[in-house]
From Swiss-Prot:
Keywords: Ribonucleoprotein, Ribosomal protein, RNA-binding, rRNA-binding. This is Small ribosomal subunit protein uS17. Belongs to the universal ribosomal protein uS17 family. GO terms for biological process: translation.
């Protein structure tokens, strides 16, 4: 009985040694995985409606959708918080935005450029 157990241990260790040897041989042949391409980021153009926070502006985005049955164009707006690192934008400016990683609880956009300053 004892010999059978030691024989089993010997075969297990031999198999483990063979596996280690195989992994060492596999190293040079292994090709690294290519990085996953980043998805396309959303970009929007809107108007600044508030700049009272530090490094944050509120931008109103307009969306026009044709009603499926009646054909009337319906205008909907939504307000988003945008990261403005240099606090360059002011109320009334037309700005370009890009979607980014979450910067705070409600901030997921960043300012790309100011397209037109308010008069």
């Amino acid at each position: 009985m004892a010999e059978a157990k030691t024989g089993a241990k010997a075969t297990k260790s031999a198999a483990a040694g063979a596996a280690d040897g195989a992994s060492k041989e596999k190293g040079p042949k292994h090709t690294p995985s290519t990085p996953k391409p980043r998805g396309r980021r959303k970009t929007r153009i809107g108007y600044v409606v508030s700049d009272k926070m530090q490094k944050t502006i509120v931008v109103e985005l307009e969306d026009r959708v044709r009603h499926p049955l009646y054909g009337k164009i319906i205008r909907t707006t939504k307000k988003v918080k945008v990261h403005d690192e240099h606090s360059a934008a002011g109320i009334g400016d037309r700005v370009s935005l890009m979607e980014t990683r979450p910067l705070s609880a409600t901030k997921r956009w960043r300012l790309v450029e100011i397209l037109e300053k308010a008069k």
